[in-house]
Swiss-Prot record:
It catalyses: RNA(n+1) + phosphate = RNA(n) + a ribonucleoside 5'-diphosphate. This is Polyribonucleotide nucleotidyltransferase. GO terms for molecular function: 3'-5'-RNA exonuclease activity; magnesium ion binding; polyribonucleotide nucleotidyltransferase activity; RNA binding. GO terms for biological process: mRNA catabolic process; RNA processing. It comes from Chlorobium luteolum (strain DSM 273 / BCRC 81028 / 2530). Belongs to the polyribonucleotide nucleotidyltransferase family. Involved in mRNA degradation. Catalyzes the phosphorolysis of single-stranded polyribonucleotides processively in the 3'- to 5'-direction. Residues 570-629 form the KH domain. The gene is pnp. Its EC number is 2.7.7.8. GO terms for cellular component: cytosol.
Length: 732
């Protein structure tokens, strides 16, 4: 049976959800449509009982944009979609982060959500529709799921908030924020803004949440009509005697350890020792208490002998101890108060050959950030369903295993690295100079050397500092901070600059980046229900104070961008040439432009309008390239003196001289010197660079070719060496 539900969200935005037509063998499948953009989402969850040793939810979310959806061919030799693009990975992460908290605690069945974009009108982006479709697919399935979830994008054009703005509307929007949530609460945020205030952000979130409520209700109605019963699920129940024993065995030790302000490695070692000792004692205790007959009569008692289950119980007490310490005493694992930011150190120019660099250290989190400046040719070509463009500002984030003291594989860039890099990039992009002001392609690379929380925000701070060190004229400096939340009933505490443990054991990870004038990017993940706007307002205000503190430290290190680019950065010079001369500069098969590059070391880029951009790390190379190009397009004029190169010597005739690139003229034997010349080779040889004057231009009546008559005698100077042929002419 095909069931379709439709809703009008206002502003001409109509969304429909359909189930029962496609992918009927999946546990759940829906098609969501807005305009002519359509996505199909499917979900399948394994019915195989997971191992009792499993302690994570193996949820896989895949988002794919099919090129046929927009009537396009994929690029590359094979002409088919291959590995996911960065856009697809980021969209999948958005959906995953919103869905994951809504599955029941302890549900560890392998689950796969696949979202395919099957039609694109190239105006309505499909990413947030994918989140809606995924939630709806789970709702109409038999898979346990707490609440319907919906995702929307909020923009603002001319002061008016818009739900799911089109690509054209986003061009004029000062907000681009994706929001995921249920009818009761927000569980995910991510977006970029043009320095908006905290109050404006809250207004945008509230506006988006109203649309989310309507979409969640639509899903509930759809699921009600499908009326598919949820499969039975009972989470693993830990025996009460095990919980009691573990509490008595380790709670006091964990509490004592929590109140010690220790370094990350020391704390990890001492925590590991408590775990090992408690597991050993518990197994000894229950092995003696339970004989074979008791285990046979009650198989659940075997859980008391399971090392993994015991460690999970210890972990729950460790989590509770840390949370109560924060809520009751306002103290944190490293001894800070709730709002205190860890010590910050900054070093600039640490990589001599980079075009800008910084080493940013905050507590036990450290980022080494380098900047590379390039030309338009270095821009990244990005092709998506909705547009094709050259990306000239990028930030890449690397998180090697040694940064957390581990051994690991070094493979392709992971989803987490792509997501963190994108957030840092969006944070800084808003203050980057425009192409007219700064026509460089900019690549920032953040190498995380140490990590104990908030490495993406360290990348924002380090990236800003590296750009300023490199002389990139940022509009304003940007800093970022990660906020945390501990909530128990009505009690809550907001934490500034969270540690890795506080992120892991807490209820929220809220990253905020911005300038002194407003927020430029944010990302939030919530692990609990019931986050109200009052808490969010407090978190934003506290984040603002933290950002300003970090900005103070950054401005102490470097108050403004350096006035000069780095020594090894390319210098860009732009000149305008006639459009009809472009082919002359490029040459046959690019021969001429390649020879200029080889000769001068400069990189040359030519636009269709005749703008020639020359990039070279030395002023000499730039000057030489400009002179060659000007000489190339120069029209020979009688009476003008040129610096040319002898190409051929004919003893009884004269010398052929290349006086402008690719153009030769003849210095007749009688025009070489005021003295009588009997043998040209006595005076000139191939390769000599000489000054000549153009004395005549005439057409050969037999061939129709233009002949150029040159004179050394008219210049009245001896041959000179060291000046390239084709230098800019000297007017007589």
């Amino acid at each position: 049976m095909i069931i379709t539900k439709e809703i009008n969200l206002g502003q001409g935005k109509t969304i429909s959800i359909e189930t029962g037509r496609m992918a009927k063998q999946a546990d759940g499948a829906t098609v969501v449509r807005m305009g002519d953009t359509m996505v199909i989402a499917t979900v399948v969850s394994s019915r195989k009982t997971p191992s009792v040793n499993q302690d994570f939810f193996p949820l896989q979310v895949e988002y794919r944009e099919k090129y046929y959806a927009a009537g396009k061919f994929p690029g590359g030799f094979f002409k088919r979609e291959a590995r996911p693009s960065e856009k697809e990975i980021l969209s999948a992460r958005l959906i995953d982060r919103a869905l994951r908290p809504l599955f029941p605690t302890g549900y560890y069945h392998e689950t796969q959500v696949i979202i395919n974009v099957i039609s694109s009108d190239q105006q309505n982006d499909a990413d947030v529709l994918g989140g809606l479709a995924a939630s709806a697919a789970i709702m109409v399935s038999d898979i346990p799921f707490e609440n319907a979830m919906s995702e929307v994008r909020v923009g603002r054009v001319n002061g008016l908030f818009i739900i799911n703005p089109t690509i054209d509307e986003l061009e004029g929007s000062d907000i681009d924020i994706s929001i995921g949530g249920t009818a009761d609460t927000i569980c995910m945020l991510e977006g970029e803004m043009k320095e908006i205030s905290e109050a404006e952000m809250l207004d945008a979130i509230k506006f988006g949440h109203e649309a989310i409520k309507k979409l969640c209700q639509l899903q509930n109605e759809l699921a009600g009509e499908v009326a598919k019963a949820k499969r039975p699920f009972t989470p693993l129940q830990v025996p009460a005697e095990l919980s009691e024993y573990v509490k008595n065995a380790c709670e006091s030790s964990l509490k004592e350890l929590a109140y010690k302000p220790l370094a990350k490695e020391v704390r990890a070692d001492e925590t590991k020792a408590i775990y090992s000792e408690t597991v050993k004692k518990a197994i000894e205790h229950f092995s003696a208490a339970f004989g074979p007959e008791a285990l046979a009569a009650d198989p659940s008692k075997a859980l008391c002998l399971n090392e993994h289950i015991i460690e999970e119980e210890i972990h729950s007490f460790e989590k509770n101890v840390m949370r109560r310490m924060i809520l009751d005493d306002g103290k944190r694992l490293d001894g800070r108060n709730l709002e205190q930011v860890r010590p910050i150190t900054i070093e600039l120019g640490v990589i001599p050959r980079a075009h800008g660099s910084a080493l940013f250290t905050r507590g036990e989190t450290q980022a080494l950030v380098a900047v590379t400046l390039g030309t338009k040719k270095d821009a990244q070509s990005v092709d998506t369903l909705t547009n094709s463009a050259d990306k000239r500002f990028m930030l890449h984030y690397n998180f090697p295993p040694f940064s957390v003291g581990e051994v690991g594989r070094l493979g392709s860039t992971g989803r987490r690295e792509i997501g963190h890099g994108n957030l840092a990039e969006r944070s800084i992009k808003m203050v980057a100079p425009g192409e007219q002001e700064f026509p460089y392609t900019v690549r920032i690379v953040s190498e995380i050397l140490e990590s104990n929380g908030s490495s993406s925000m360290a990348s924002v701070c380090g990236g800003t500092l590296a750009l300023m060190d490199g002389g990139v004229p940022l509009k304003k400096p940007v800093s970022g901070i990660a906020m945390g939340l501990i909530k128990d009933g009505e009690e809550y505490a907001v934490l500034s600059d969270i540690l890795g443990n506080e992120d892991h054991l807490g209820d929220m990870d809220f990253k905020v980046a911005g300038t002194r004038d407003g927020i430029t990017a944010c990302q939030m993940d919530i692990k609990i229900d019931g986050l109200d706007y009052h808490i969010l307002e407090n978190a934003l205000a506290q984040a603002r104070r933290g950002r300003f503190h970090i900005l103070d430290k950054m401005e102490e290190a470097i108050p403004a961008s350096r006035e000069e680019l780095a020594q090894y950065a390319p210098r860009l010079t732009a000149i305008q040439v006639p459009v009809e001369s472009i082919g002359l500069i490029i040459g046959k098969g690019g021969e001429t432009i390649r020879s200029i590059t080889e000769e001068t070391g400069a990189e040359i880029n030519i636009e269709d309008d005749g703008t020639v951009t020359i990039a070279c790390s030395s002023n000499e190379g730039t000057k030489a390239a400009v002179e060659i190009i000007k000489a190339l397009i120069a029209k020979p004029e009688v009476g003008t003196i040129y610096v040319g190169k002898v190409r051929d010597v004919r003893d009884e005739l004269g010398a052929f001289v290349e006086f402008i690139p690719k153009t030769d003229g003849l210095v007749h034997i009688s025009e070489i010197s005021r003295e009588r010349v009997t043998k040209v080779s006595d005076h000139l040889k191939v390769g000599d660079r000489i000054k000549v004057k153009l004395v005549d231009i005439r057409k050969d009546p037999r061939t129709g070719k233009t002949r150029f008559a040159l004179s050394m005698k008219a210049v009245d100077e001896e041959p000179v060496n060291g000046t390239e042929a084709g230098a800019a002419p000297e007017n007589n």
